[in-house]
Amino acid sequence: MRTLPLRAGVLVGAMLITMLLPSSPAHAAPTLASRMAAVQNANVINYYPSNAGWTFMWTNFDVIRVHADLNQAAWLGADTVRVIVFPQTFGYPVPSAAYTQKLDTVIDVAESNGLNVKLTLFDWWSGYSDVANSIAWAQTLLAPYANDPRVIAVELKNEIPPNDATAINWARQLIPAVRTTAPTMPLTLTVDGTSGATGMATLKAQLAGTPLDYYDFHFYGASERSLAEIRRAQDAVAPTPMVIGETGVSTVSGTEGEQGAYLARVFRAAAEAGVGSVAPWTLNDFAQGAIPPNSTVSTQPAQYKFGLYRTDASPKIAASVVDDAWTTGTTSNSILNLGFEAAAADSPWRQYQPQAGAAVITTESPRTGSQSARFSGTTRAGSNLPSLVTSPITPVQAGQQWHAEAYARGVAATGITEISMSWFTISGTWISQHTSNRLPTGNSSWTKLSVDAVAPAGAASVQLHLKSGDNTGTVYYDDVAIS
């Protein structure tokens, strides 16, 4: 991943110069078509400062930090930043001039870093019965940007409840009113990740008379099933275009390697589905105290660790995944750590049935490189053998041919040592498995275990298991491949 070129002193100087420059020259007015083209291909980063999340971004506004962060996002490959505003913070029903100036500054700073802006309105909002003031507030806030090509789209409400009749009535009136103010501005609404495709279908059906320009999918499901989930969401809103406006996984309970693999799978699945815009949540982790304490979000430990960067601005491995996806259009299988050479924090391998024997990474007996995985003194859990498990970056589709292999070596090995591919439906229901040849018991040299299979009907994901159970001796694994 490329390194950020600016240092603090240079950055402050650059920012001060930027603030003293005259206003930017007038831009050519955008069309709905030009904005929609930008929306469907945007490299969007979700953003709050690491020390000032949600409403604190505005109440504790720090233009120098915003400039530094957006410069970092641009070097990562982002070309658009999502900016979220809050009626209660900005002033409602009349926006405060002080806060609209802060918004204008953020848009200017984004432009200075080569970034467009997607605006989200009415976050942390439930005042759906106040339609008239909602319309007036939105029109006042958006009027300066109606013909500003730096603002490419507006999400009217973040994660609207699709089964709330009052909320839907509010949206039905807000959509045409905003269009009178900004007729070339693409408009969207989102539902939460739990509602998913079902919620999107419900929303679309209820807005048939006031349709949205595109749909924005918030995806936090199992990444190995992301292609099936993305296609289900597309089907729910077809033929209206769809982008992925939020996706990611927290590192509070999983490794940073798992986060990197998660995003690699989503980017690759989106490309397969023809979705050209994927927006990771979020640029930074959040420091303790950075999320407003009056919010439910602040009580959820996972919310503090979704960032591509840690709070000290150092990158997690997921940052390199996003960098590659945005700047080269590719996602590498190297994130899977198939040779066990990565640091533990950067490995996406997970333990399955560790109570029956957990694998450890060791330098004792590598086949290639300097490390391998070792099982010793394992048992079993019912019919299940302990294993290391991962899933490929390439999405699964029924009828595909798959091959997996790994090299194993035994030292006084007993029991069963094999690899397997386990297939699952879109809902995570196990379908079947295919297993490899087994490693001979006793002492053995490095032996290739391999399995070939066709993804069965209904398969949406596959797990690769490296197993060793009922083993009173030791088994080493190295040099795994799956394709």
Indicate residue ranges for each PLM-predicted region:
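Secretory targeting and sorting signals
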Residues: M1-A28
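Extracellular glycoside hydrolase catalytic/binding regions
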Residues: A143, R150, I160-G276, T282, ...
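Residue-level detector of anion-binding/catalytic polar loops
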Residues: D79, G114-N116, P186, P241, ...
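Short, solvent-exposed loop/turn elements at domain surfaces
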Residues: N41, S50-M57, Q288-G289, I317, ...
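Active-site mouth of glycoside hydrolases
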Residues: P30-L212
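Aromatic- and carboxylate-lined catalytic core of secreted/periplasmic carbohydrate-active enzymes
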Residues: F267-G339
